[in-house]
Amino acid sequence: MYKDIKKSIAELLVLPISNERKETLSALVAYVQHKVTADLDVNINFICTHNSRRSHLSQIWAQVAASYYNIPRVFCCSGGTEATALYPKVVDTLVNTGFVIDKLSEADNPIYIIKYADSVMPIVGFSKTYDHLFNPKRGFAAVMTCVQADGGCPFVAGAEKRIPIIFEDPKVSDGTPEQTKVYSQRSSQIASEMFYVFSMIKTNRC
Protein backbone atom coordinates (compact mmCIF):
# COMPACT_ATOMS: atom_id res chain seq x y z
CA MET A 1 0.00 0.00 0.00
CA TYR A 2 1.35 3.41 -0.93
CA LYS A 3 3.08 5.43 1.78
CA ASP A 4 0.81 8.48 1.50
CA ILE A 5 -2.31 6.33 1.76
CA LYS A 6 -0.92 4.64 4.87
CA LYS A 7 -0.39 8.09 6.35
CA SER A 8 -3.98 9.08 5.51
CA ILE A 9 -5.28 5.84 7.03
CA ALA A 10 -3.41 6.50 10.27
CA GLU A 11 -5.16 9.86 10.49
CA LEU A 12 -8.65 8.58 9.74
CA LEU A 13 -8.42 5.62 12.13
CA VAL A 14 -8.58 8.01 15.08
CA LEU A 15 -11.66 9.85 13.84
CA PRO A 16 -14.63 9.41 16.22
CA ILE A 17 -17.70 7.42 15.15
CA SER A 18 -20.85 7.84 17.22
CA ASN A 19 -22.71 4.87 18.69
CA GLU A 20 -25.69 5.83 16.55
CA ARG A 21 -23.58 5.67 13.43
CA LYS A 22 -22.05 2.35 14.50
CA GLU A 23 -25.58 0.99 14.78
CA THR A 24 -26.22 2.13 11.20
CA LEU A 25 -23.08 0.32 10.08
CA SER A 26 -23.88 -2.87 12.00
CA ALA A 27 -25.96 -4.38 9.19
CA LEU A 28 -23.02 -4.16 6.81
CA VAL A 29 -20.70 -5.62 9.45
CA ALA A 30 -23.09 -8.54 9.89
CA TYR A 31 -23.39 -9.12 6.14
CA VAL A 32 -19.63 -9.15 5.58
CA GLN A 33 -19.05 -11.35 8.64
CA HIS A 34 -21.63 -13.88 7.46
CA LYS A 35 -19.95 -14.17 4.07
CA VAL A 36 -16.44 -14.41 5.49
CA THR A 37 -17.45 -17.05 8.04
CA ALA A 38 -19.09 -19.09 5.28
CA ASP A 39 -15.98 -18.69 3.09
CA LEU A 40 -17.98 -16.97 0.36
CA ASP A 41 -17.31 -13.99 -1.89
CA VAL A 42 -18.30 -10.65 -0.38
CA ASN A 43 -19.96 -8.58 -3.10
CA ILE A 44 -21.02 -5.05 -2.16
CA ASN A 45 -22.67 -2.58 -4.54
CA PHE A 46 -22.71 1.00 -3.24
CA ILE A 47 -25.61 2.86 -4.84
CA CYS A 48 -26.48 6.55 -5.14
CA THR A 49 -28.46 8.58 -7.63
CA HIS A 50 -25.73 9.57 -10.12
CA ASN A 51 -22.80 7.33 -9.13
CA SER A 52 -20.62 10.43 -9.14
CA ARG A 53 -19.55 11.15 -5.55
CA ARG A 54 -20.62 9.24 -2.43
CA SER A 55 -21.06 5.82 -3.99
CA HIS A 56 -17.61 5.95 -5.58
CA LEU A 57 -15.96 7.13 -2.37
CA SER A 58 -17.70 4.32 -0.49
CA GLN A 59 -16.68 1.69 -3.03
CA ILE A 60 -13.06 2.78 -3.11
CA TRP A 61 -12.57 3.15 0.63
CA ALA A 62 -14.35 -0.13 1.37
CA GLN A 63 -12.04 -1.96 -1.04
CA VAL A 64 -8.99 -0.34 0.54
CA ALA A 65 -10.23 -1.19 4.05
CA ALA A 66 -10.77 -4.84 3.12
CA SER A 67 -7.22 -4.97 1.77
CA TYR A 68 -5.80 -3.20 4.82
CA TYR A 69 -7.38 -5.73 7.19
CA ASN A 70 -6.65 -8.69 4.92
CA ILE A 71 -10.31 -9.65 4.53
CA PRO A 72 -10.38 -12.11 1.62
CA ARG A 73 -12.63 -12.21 -1.43
CA VAL A 74 -14.16 -8.76 -1.05
CA PHE A 75 -15.37 -7.21 -4.30
CA CYS A 76 -16.75 -3.67 -4.09
CA CYS A 77 -18.50 -1.86 -6.92
CA SER A 78 -20.85 1.08 -7.29
CA GLY A 79 -23.70 2.33 -9.43
CA GLY A 80 -26.51 4.83 -9.69
CA THR A 81 -30.13 5.02 -10.63
CA GLU A 82 -28.70 6.85 -13.65
CA ALA A 83 -25.19 7.29 -15.08
CA THR A 84 -23.46 10.67 -15.25
CA ALA A 85 -19.70 10.89 -14.58
CA LEU A 86 -17.29 10.47 -11.71
CA TYR A 87 -17.06 14.03 -10.42
CA PRO A 88 -13.56 15.51 -10.93
CA LYS A 89 -13.35 16.85 -7.37
CA VAL A 90 -13.70 13.30 -6.08
CA VAL A 91 -10.68 12.34 -8.18
CA ASP A 92 -8.73 15.34 -6.85
CA THR A 93 -9.65 14.44 -3.28
CA LEU A 94 -8.47 10.87 -3.69
CA VAL A 95 -5.20 11.98 -5.30
CA ASN A 96 -4.60 14.31 -2.36
CA THR A 97 -5.10 11.32 -0.06
CA GLY A 98 -2.39 9.31 -1.80
CA PHE A 99 -4.13 7.39 -4.58
CA VAL A 100 -2.51 7.15 -8.00
CA ILE A 101 -5.17 7.75 -10.64
CA ASP A 102 -4.92 7.51 -14.41
CA LYS A 103 -7.62 8.86 -16.70
CA LEU A 104 -8.06 6.58 -19.69
CA SER A 105 -10.29 8.79 -21.83
CA GLU A 106 -11.61 12.32 -22.26
CA ALA A 107 -15.21 11.22 -22.82
CA ASP A 108 -18.21 12.73 -21.06
CA ASN A 109 -18.04 9.77 -18.69
CA PRO A 110 -14.29 9.05 -18.37
CA ILE A 111 -12.88 5.77 -17.13
CA TYR A 112 -10.31 6.01 -14.34
CA ILE A 113 -7.79 3.48 -13.08
CA ILE A 114 -7.46 4.01 -9.33
CA LYS A 115 -4.46 2.48 -7.57
CA TYR A 116 -3.67 2.28 -3.85
CA ALA A 117 -0.92 -0.36 -4.01
CA ASP A 118 1.25 -2.00 -6.64
CA SER A 119 0.49 -5.50 -5.38
CA VAL A 120 -3.29 -5.50 -5.96
CA MET A 121 -5.62 -5.01 -8.89
CA PRO A 122 -6.54 -1.34 -9.39
CA ILE A 123 -10.09 -0.10 -8.99
CA VAL A 124 -11.89 0.91 -12.18
CA GLY A 125 -13.97 4.06 -11.70
CA PHE A 126 -16.68 5.38 -14.00
CA SER A 127 -20.33 6.31 -13.60
CA LYS A 128 -22.84 3.57 -14.39
CA THR A 129 -26.24 2.32 -13.36
CA TYR A 130 -26.31 -0.13 -10.48
CA ASP A 131 -27.34 -2.97 -12.80
CA HIS A 132 -24.52 -2.33 -15.31
CA LEU A 133 -22.75 -5.38 -16.75
CA PHE A 134 -19.66 -4.37 -14.77
CA ASN A 135 -21.50 -5.08 -11.50
CA PRO A 136 -22.67 -8.40 -10.02
CA LYS A 137 -26.12 -9.57 -11.02
CA ARG A 138 -26.96 -11.49 -7.84
CA GLY A 139 -25.62 -12.39 -4.43
CA PHE A 140 -24.61 -8.90 -3.32
CA ALA A 141 -25.44 -6.33 -0.68
CA ALA A 142 -26.95 -3.12 -2.03
CA VAL A 143 -25.70 -0.29 0.17
CA MET A 144 -27.78 2.84 -0.41
CA THR A 145 -25.59 5.88 0.21
CA CYS A 146 -28.08 8.69 -0.44
CA VAL A 147 -31.67 9.42 0.54
CA GLN A 148 -32.83 9.84 -3.06
CA ALA A 149 -31.62 6.40 -4.13
CA ASP A 150 -32.86 4.81 -0.93
CA GLY A 151 -36.35 6.21 -1.43
CA GLY A 152 -36.49 6.07 -5.21
CA CYS A 153 -35.10 2.57 -5.60
CA PRO A 154 -36.96 0.38 -3.10
CA PHE A 155 -36.13 -2.82 -4.99
CA VAL A 156 -32.66 -3.69 -6.31
CA ALA A 157 -32.83 -6.78 -8.51
CA GLY A 158 -30.41 -9.50 -7.46
CA ALA A 159 -29.55 -8.00 -4.09
CA GLU A 160 -29.74 -10.42 -1.18
CA LYS A 161 -29.48 -7.58 1.35
CA ARG A 162 -30.41 -3.91 1.15
CA ILE A 163 -28.56 -1.68 3.61
CA PRO A 164 -29.11 2.09 3.91
CA ILE A 165 -25.96 3.96 4.97
CA ILE A 166 -26.67 7.58 4.14
CA PHE A 167 -23.93 10.20 3.71
CA GLU A 168 -24.40 13.93 3.24
CA ASP A 169 -23.73 15.09 -0.31
CA PRO A 170 -20.52 17.11 -0.73
CA LYS A 171 -22.12 18.57 -3.87
CA VAL A 172 -23.59 21.33 -1.69
CA SER A 173 -20.11 22.90 -1.61
CA ASP A 174 -19.58 22.96 -5.38
CA GLY A 175 -18.68 26.45 -6.58
CA THR A 176 -17.83 27.68 -3.07
CA PRO A 177 -14.51 28.37 -1.30
CA GLU A 178 -15.34 25.47 1.04
CA GLN A 179 -15.40 22.81 -1.68
CA THR A 180 -11.98 21.27 -1.05
CA LYS A 181 -12.58 21.13 2.70
CA VAL A 182 -16.06 19.63 2.37
CA TYR A 183 -14.99 16.93 -0.08
CA SER A 184 -12.03 16.04 2.12
CA GLN A 185 -14.26 15.80 5.18
CA ARG A 186 -16.80 13.61 3.42
CA SER A 187 -14.10 11.34 2.04
CA SER A 188 -12.56 11.03 5.50
CA GLN A 189 -15.91 10.24 7.10
CA ILE A 190 -16.71 7.56 4.55
CA ALA A 191 -13.20 6.11 4.84
CA SER A 192 -13.36 6.07 8.63
CA GLU A 193 -16.68 4.25 8.62
CA MET A 194 -15.63 1.68 6.02
CA PHE A 195 -12.48 1.00 8.03
CA TYR A 196 -14.61 0.54 11.13
CA VAL A 197 -16.76 -2.02 9.30
CA PHE A 198 -13.83 -4.14 8.17
CA SER A 199 -11.98 -3.79 11.48
CA MET A 200 -14.89 -5.65 13.08
CA ILE A 201 -14.59 -8.71 10.82
CA LYS A 202 -13.13 -11.91 12.25
CA THR A 203 -11.52 -14.17 9.66
CA ASN A 204 -11.22 -17.95 9.68
CA ARG A 205 -7.45 -17.78 9.55
CA CYS A 206 -5.47 -18.82 12.61
Regions found by a protein language model. Give the residues of each.
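Short polar/charged helix/loop
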Residues: 2-206
